[in-house]
Amino acid sequence: MYIDKFKNKGYIFLEDPKTWPKDWISLIEKNRELIINYLDEDAAILEECNKLKESGRESENKYDVENSFSKKIGRFTKTFKALILSTNQQILCYHATRLMDYEVELIKQNGLKKCSLELRKEKIDNLLEYNIINKYEYEILSNKENNPLVLRPKRLNNTDLIWGYNTFDINDYEDCAYFLNDYGGEMIDQASFSNELKVKLQKASKPYIIICIDKISLFAVKSNKSENEYFENIIKPYINNDEIKFLNFQLKNIDSLPIHDVVKYDLWNE
C-alpha cells in the first residue's frame, strides 16, 4: 500500500491505534470500564425503547433520560480533548475522490478547501468549458432549485469539502473501491442522473487519494458537541475493536487543509 511508506515516520493515523501517542492509549485504557459501562447502558436503553415502541407502549417510556454515566464520560472526553490539543505530532488524513487533471494542480496549490456554491458552480462551468458535458446536461447539474436530484455541497451523508468526502481508510476496499469505481463527479449522486452523464463524468476523472496533513487541533471544532465527536469517532471504535481497520471521521471548520500529496490510486491495478 502507498501509505505504508509513511508508517513509523512520526505521523498519527487516526484509523491506526498503533500510531497513537502512548498517553492517549493510557488515558483510554484507564477509563475502559467507564466507557464500557456507558456503552452498555446506552445499548440497554435503546433496546428497551425499541421494545416499547414495537409494542405500541411508547408513552410508557421511562428511559427518555440521560445515561447515568454521561457526566463522567463528559469529563473524560474533555480530558481527552485537552490531551489531543497538547499533542505536537501531525496526522495524515486520506480523502478518496475522483479528479480531473486540472483539479490535481489546483488542490496541490490551494489545499483542500471547504465547499461553497461558488466553487461548485465553477466546477460545473469547467465541465462545460472542457466539453465534458453539453448545455442540456449543464442545466441539469446547475438547476438546483428546479431539480431536487442535484445535491447540495454534500456527498456521502456528511461532508462539506469541495474535493474530498468523508475520510476513508484506503484499506477499506468495499466502500472505497465502490466509490472510486462508480462516482464520476463531486456533485453527482449515483442514482440521480442518467447513466450516460455518469459515464461521461467518470471518464473525465481519475481515482485519487488526497493525503492531507495538519495538527491535531483540526478536531478542535467550536461546537458544544465537540467532545462527543472525540468519543464517537475515536474512542468508541477503539474500545469496540482494538484492531481498527476503518475509522470514519469528519473534518469541520477548516478554511484549507494543507496537502501532503495527491496520488493517483487505482485499487484494481496496484
Give the label of every model feature segment.
Residues 1-66, 70-71, 83-85, 89-90, ...:
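Conserved NAD+-utilizing ADP-ribose enzyme module
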Residues 72-78:
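N-terminal onset of structured domains
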Residues 78-79, 147-149, 195:
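Sparse, context-dependent recognition of short Cys/His-centered cofactor- or disulfide-binding micro-motifs
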Residues 77, 93-97:
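N-terminal, charge-rich interaction modules
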Residues 102-163, 172-176:
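Glycine-rich loop/turn
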